[in-house]
Amino acid sequence: QPEDVPKSYAQAMKIGEKLGAYVVSRLKQPQTLSNSQLVFRRQLVKFPLQNQGFQQLSQAGVVKRVFSDSVDSEIAYTAIGNAAMATHPGETSPALSLSTRGLMKNTGPKMILGLSQDALGYILKPTFFETGNTIPHSQYLTSMSVGPQTMNIIRETLQNLIK
C-alpha cells in the first residue's frame, strides 16, 4: 500500500521472493523461548456500525448475523514466552499493524493476526472516510468497512490488553 512503490506483478514477485528467502533463513536460526509463560487476554468490543450495507445484507439473509447500530466482536492478545500475537477482527491496513507492533513490549516475535475472531471488512484510517479525500479506491474500501471509528477502537482495546 505504499504510494511510492510500483504496483506490478514483478514487484509483487520481488517482495514475495524476498520474504520467502528471509523466512527460510530464519528457519536455519531458530529462536528459543526465554520462558514458557502463557498469557491470554481478550475483550468483547462494540463497534459503531455506520455502513448500512451490512444491515441490509443481514436483513436480506445474505449474512447470518444481526447488525444494528453497532456490531459486537472480540479482540485478543496472546503471549507465549517472549513471542506475542494480537488479533485484528478484519483486514487491517499497514498503519494499524505497525501501530499494534509498537504497543507490544516483548523482545521476541510480534505477530498480527488479521481476520481473527471476526471478519468485519476493511479496517481503515479515519481519513479514508473524509468527504473529498484523494485516497485511491477509498469509496470502495469504505463501502466494505464497518465505519471510521473501528481502527481507533481496535488500537485502544489492544493498548489495554497489552500491559
Show which residues each predicted segment covers:
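Non-catalytic substrate/cofactor recognition surfaces at enzyme active-site rims
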Residues: 1-163
